[in-house]
Structure formats: C-alpha cells, structure tokens
Regions:
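Hydrophobic alpha-helical segments within soluble ligand-binding/sensing domains
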Residues: 162-187, 223-229, 288-308
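Flexible loop/turn connectors
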Residues: 232-240, 246-326
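Short beta-strand segments enriched in small/hydrophobic residues
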Residues: 20-24, 60-75, 184-191
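Short, solvent-exposed amphipathic alpha-helices that sit
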Residues: 78-93, 169-172, 196-211, 250-254, ...
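N-terminal helix-turn-helix DNA-binding module of bacterial transcription factors
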Residues: 1-65
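An alpha-beta-alpha
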Residues: 173-213, 309-326
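Amphipathic helical "hinge" segments at domain boundaries
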Residues: 52-114, 121
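Flexible loop/hinge segments that line or gate small-molecule binding clefts
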Residues: 128-171, 271-283
C-alpha cells in the first residue's frame, strides 16, 4: 500500500483548504451543498493523490448495524456539540449514523446509556466518560466492540483515545502570564475527582504556581456573586483560571468583569468556540479543537470497524490534538 493510499479525509480537507464536512459531502455525492469550484478542487486533489476511500469500511456498514453510539458527558457543553459535529462528518462518509446519548453529568445516567449500548446492536462507541471505573469499560473490550475514548484517558486500559495536550498547554499558558504578577491563583472547574482531563490541567497549572486554590462547581450551579465574596474579581493580582468554557463565559459576562478596565489579563481558561474572544478581545485563552478531535475519533473507529477478523485491539491509537494559547 502506498503512502497516498493511506491518506485520510482530514488530509484531503487540508490539501483542498476546505472543511472535513465538505469532503464528506463530496464523497457522499452531495454536490448541491458546495460550489462547483469547490467540488472540482476536491476532485482534482483526490485524483492527484490517488486517494482511495476505505471500501472495506463501507462494505462492513452494509453487513452490520450502521449505528455508532456517541456517549457525551454533557451535551449542554460547547465542547460536546462541537466534537459531535466532527464525529458525524466522518461517520456519514462511510454510511454510519452517530446516535448522541447525553449522560447529563450523571454517573447513573451514563451507566444506563452504556448498558443500553451494550445490549443493542451498535457497531461501535465513542465515549467521553464520567466514570473512572475501568470495569465499566472493560466489558465492551471483552465483547470486542470497537470503542474510542474522547477527551479522556483510563490509565489501566489499553484502548484508543483522542485527547489534547492538557498538561503541557496549561503549564505553558501559566508561564506566559508573568507568574510574578499574581499573588493569588484560583482554578475554577467542575468536580475534578479522577477525571484525567481535569487532573492533568490542574497539575500543569501547579507546576508554575505553588499555591493554587481549586474551586469545584457545576456549570448550572455556578454563582459568580458567591465567588466574588471570596475572590476579589477586580484585583489584578488575583488570577482566575477556568477549565471549562461554559463557566468562563459566566464570568466574562458578569457585571463585575464588564466594568473592569482590563489593563492586565487576570482571567483565562480553556475555550472551544470564539465566544470568549468577543467578550474579552484583548485576552488570550487556551483554544481547543473539539471538531477535529471528534473527526479524529471517528476516523480511528472506522479503522477499528475495518480491522480484519475484528482484531482492532492490535491497532490501538492514542492521538493528541494540540491546543494553543493565543
């Protein structure tokens, strides 16, 4: 097999300077959803690179269920909706349908969804787990159901995953903020527990700041007024680092923030969309790429579904999609 034949949809999209979704539509014959010039450009690149669509995966889709379960920790989060779009853009190109199941930040709900997926005829699963109990996931592996984790890692299980560079980018961003300028550092996050994403972000922050106050809350219960009673939001020496965009937006839209002059940045965090940049155009944030993470997770799953003799566990992939502080 040549290098050209190993190209993915993501590669074709980059070469054509279009979105993954646009390439997916082209492959599905949905030419009415793009300009003729775009269609011709994609066609030219596919011809020049000898790109071969994974026909084995397409044939598999005809022989088994074409449903893929996508179990999200909470679809109210911008991150979840963005990565689901990325997942669907790839699955649809191979004849699969993504079925979104919302755990709603509730372990019992997640467990019920996983039981349902296990007992139903799903081709595979892409999971953003709340649980850190590897036994819950292991039975899928034992049943040989293809599974890919997104935004999470489980250290004691060997399985495919797509994450971002949480530790490295958190450490880098903190170093860029002139640490000596701050006397107090407060991290605002949903409950950390043992969730790998949150644990590694906090660890990255603590490599730069020795003393860090971690406030755990839930997006739907976050009260900025209550936070203001313990943290002086107007004091430029107080740094706030928010690990979820939804929490960050609640801070950026609060009157106490809107009334500040913002000569010095004292709020930053992880973001998934451009909204925080409109609210604080002079601030830098840690920009994730959830759409690309979702598309990458779907591509891995398609490869697993195409594995000879369903022996996908011999082809484990752990992909890191870098986030950027900008």
């Amino acid at each position: 097999m040549t290098n050209q034949q190993k190209l993915t949809i993501s590669d074709i999209a980059k070469l054509a300077n279009v979105s993954i979704a646009t390439v997916s539509r082209y492959l599905n014959g949905q030419l009415n959803q793009m300009s003729e010039a775009t269609a011709q450009k994609i066609k030219k690149i596919i011809t020049e690179t000898d790109y071969i669509r994974n026909s084995a995966a397409v044939q598999l889709a005809k022989k088994r269920s074409n449903l893929v379960a996508v179990v999200a920790s909470n679809i109210d989060e911008y991150f979840s909706s963005e990565y689901f779009k990325g997942i669907v853009s790839i699955l649809s190109a191979f004849g699969y349908i993504g079925v979104l199941l919302d755990s709603d930040s509730n372990l019992k709900t997640e467990k019920a969804h996983l039981e349902s997926v296990y007992n139903q005829n799903f081709a595979g699963i892409i999971l953003q787990p709340l649980t850190t109990d590897s036994a819950v996931i292991r039975k899928f592996l034992n049943h040989n159901m293809p599974i890919v984790l997104i935004d999470r890692e489980l250290a004691d299980l060997e399985m495919s995953s797509v994450t971002t560079n949480n530790f490295e980018i958190a450490k880098y961003a903190m170093a860029q903020l002139a640490p000596d300028s701050f006397s107090n550092v407060t991290v605002i996050t949903e409950p950390v527990k043992k969730i790998s994403t949150r644990v590694t972000r906090v660890a990255g922050i603590k490599t730069v700041f020795d003393q860090v106050n971690v406030i755990e809350t839930r997006s739907e219960h976050f009260d900025v007024n209550q936070l203001a009673t313990t943290v002086d939001l107007n004091n430029p020496q107080n740094l706030l680092v928010v690990l979820k965009e939804r929490l960050l937006i609640q801070l950026l839209t609060h009157p106490s923030f809107l009334m500040q002059a913002h000569q010095t940045q004292n709020i930053t965090g992880f973001i998934d969309t451009t909204m925080p940049r409109y609210l604080a155009p002079n601030f830098k944030f840690i920009q994730q790429s959830p759409y690309l993470m979702g598309a990458s997770a779907a591509e891995i799953l398609i490869k697993h579904l195409s594995s000879a003799n369903n022996d996908y566990q011999q082809n484990i992939q752990n992909i890191i999609i870098p986030s950027h502080y900008k």
